[in-house]
Amino acid sequence: MTLWMRLLPLLTLLVLWEPNPAQAFVNQHLCGSHLVEALYLVCGERGFFYTPKSRRGVEDPQVAQLELGGGPGADDLQTLALEVAQQKRGIVDQCCTSICSLYQLENYCN
């Protein structure tokens, strides 16, 4: 009984000290390696997708045509691309420039 009485304050302290899982990750700014580590943590074995703008332009011929100003209906495509670019936010805009949550990070998992 005396052992239990000695351990009770310690157990109470441990229970109170343990962070609540919902509060363990508050919305925060994540940039660079911290962003990558958070993605690994959230996505786990599923992994995540990442396509830098410089590589995306090389791999996607339509984007390359838009940047060079060529191709059929280039003016219409350029206008559409600008509208989409203004609406679409990347992970850096969401999590580094602004703050993001675990749920927003999960959108980038495979």
From Swiss-Prot:
Domain of life: Eukaryota
Any one GO molecular-function label of the UniProt entry: insulin receptor binding
Gene Ontology biological process terms in this record: cellular response to oxygen-containing compound; glucose homeostasis; glucose metabolic process; positive regulation of protein secretion
SMART domains named in the record: IlGF
GO annotation, cellular component aspect: extracellular space
Disulfide bonds: C31-C96, C43-C109, C95-C100
Xref: InterPro entries: Insulin, Insulin-like, Insulin-like_sf, Insulin_CS, Insulin_family
Keyword terms, alphabetized: Carbohydrate metabolism, Cleavage on pair of basic residues, Disulfide bond, Glucose metabolism, Hormone, Secreted, Signal
Function description: Insulin decreases blood glucose concentration. It increases cell permeability to monosaccharides, amino acids and fatty acids. It accelerates glycolysis, the pentose phosphate cycle, and glycogen synthesis in liver.
Subunit and interaction comment: Heterodimer of a B chain and an A chain linked by two disulfide bonds.
Family assignment from sequence similarity: Belongs to the insulin family.
Name of the protein this chain belongs to: Insulin
Organism: Cricetulus longicaudatus (Long-tailed dwarf hamster)
